[in-house]
From Swiss-Prot:
Keywords: 4Fe-4S, ADP-ribosylation, ATP-binding, Iron, Iron-sulfur, Metal-binding, Nitrogen fixation, Nucleotide-binding, Oxidoreductase
The protein's name: Nitrogenase iron protein
Annotated positions of the ADP-ribosylarginine modification: R97
Its EC number(s): 1.18.6.1
Cofactor: binding details: Binds 1 [4Fe-4S] cluster per dimer.
Post-translational changes noted in the entry: The reversible ADP-ribosylation of Arg-97 inactivates the nitrogenase reductase and regulates nitrogenase activity.
Binding, ATP: G8, K9, G10, G11, I12, G13, K14, S15
Gene Ontology molecular function: 4 iron, 4 sulfur cluster binding; ATP binding; metal ion binding; nitrogenase activity
Known function: The key enzymatic reactions in nitrogen fixation are catalyzed by the nitrogenase complex, which has 2 components: the iron protein and the molybdenum-iron protein.
Binding, [4Fe-4S] cluster: C94, C129
Amino acid sequence: MRQVAIYGKGGIGKSTTTQNTVAALAESGKKVMVVGCDPKADSTRLLLHGLNQKTVLDTLRDEGDDIELESILKTGFGETRCVESGGPEPGVGCAGRGIITSINMLEQLGAYTDDLDYVFYDVLGDVVCGGFAMPIREGKAREIYIVASGELMALYAANNIAKGIKKYAETGGVRLGGIICNSRKADNEYALVKAVAEEIGTQMIHFVPRDNIVQRAEINKMTVIDFDPAANQANEYRKLAKAIDENQMFVVPKPMTQDRLEELMMKHGFLDAV
């Protein structure tokens, strides 16, 4: 069983990318569980065709500790197993703690069965705060992929996340598997993201082009694989899934300084030198 965490800045398309990749893996016959680690609880919506799944934390609040696995785990597209950890009430408590509680509960209830090929953790976070780092800190997720684009803040967040991974890689077995570029059609985006990936010692594992079919599929509460399996974009997600499935490059990242990141941006024509 490979345990994979997907990180990236808010709004970069982590949940969409994760669900489409998982759908492609499921289509190819892999058995996959997705654990949403975001208080928005939207990490499994497309796999479940819009079902507003009750989160682990809400279930615990309503029913106490004596809950059944069926109460928190739903089956989605391609027999994927879908869980949302949820979060505390706004302004109260730490969402990261919710992730810890949820994963512990899933372990207690026997969700991590031997027949699973993958568990994906879709994790909120521009910065790897202690709670949100839990899937890597506790050694649950062994491989990390960062979703980024060719925009400064996305790459700044990716570099920050690499710092967090480096910290935990030194004491545990977690490794960075690569950067997924979720294109925003920025100038020189492919070359820039590839250069940033290489600078921190990893690879751009796939460049996902921008395509409006992703939004059309989302409006219909589906992944692209489900909505239009013959679409070019569906094939892009299949390529990403295959790249992850066959990946052999797992590294301890070498994060950049802020100055070096800005140097790379300038080199690729993003920031005008003052």
